[in-house]
Curated annotation (Swiss-Prot):
It comes from the Bacteria. It comes from Anaeromyxobacter sp. (strain Fw109-5). Disulfide bonds: none annotated. NCBIfam families: PRK12497.1-3 (NF009150), PRK12497.3-3 (NF009154). GO terms for molecular function: nucleic acid binding. InterPro entries: Restrct_endonuc-II-like, tRNA_endonuc-like_dom_sf, UPF0102_YraN-like. Belongs to the UPF0102 family. This is UPF0102 protein Anae109_1947.
Length: 133
């Protein structure tokens, strides 16, 4: 195995751990988890949740350092559009587009003292345009 494959494997493992941390965080915050890793040819959404009457499509991002910015800053417009595409597919299969929907980001920063988790509600809109930055 080359170093690049090892690093990629480490990133994937960290990503899976971040998704588990995000799911537990959202559950404790009162979100109902509806689905995980809903994927289509056009995109994927990490978590589908319900907060009250709102269906929330959640992108989970993680970093080991904020020296280059927080994990939430790594969601570009292209990634947001892919999440929206997967969310649209999920909504059409599960109640239709008339549901109230929101696109959130959960940022997990792995620190020595333990992971730091932040929720950004409405991080981008249904067209993939950022709402936070």
């Amino acid at each position: 195995m080359t170093d690049g494959e090892g690093e990629a494997g480490d990133r994937r493992a960290r990503g899976r751990e971040a998704e588990r941390i995000a799911e537990a965080f959202l559950s404790r915050a009162g979100f109902e988890i509806l689905d995980r890793n809903h994927a289509t040819r056009r995109g994927e959404v990490d978590l589908v949740c319900r907060e009250g009457s709102v269906v929330c499509f959640v992108e989970v991002r993680s970093r080991t350092s904020t020296a280059q910015g927080g994990p939430e800053e790594t969601v570009g417009r292209g990634k947001a559009r892919r999440v929206v595409a997967a969310a649209t597919d999920w909504a059409l299969r599960n109640g239709g587009l008339e549901q109230e929907m929101r696109f959130d980001v959960v940022a997990v920063t792995f620190e020595e003292a333990g992971p730091r988790v932040a929720l950004y509600r409405g991080a981008f809109d249904g067209e993939g345009k950022p709402g936070l930055w």
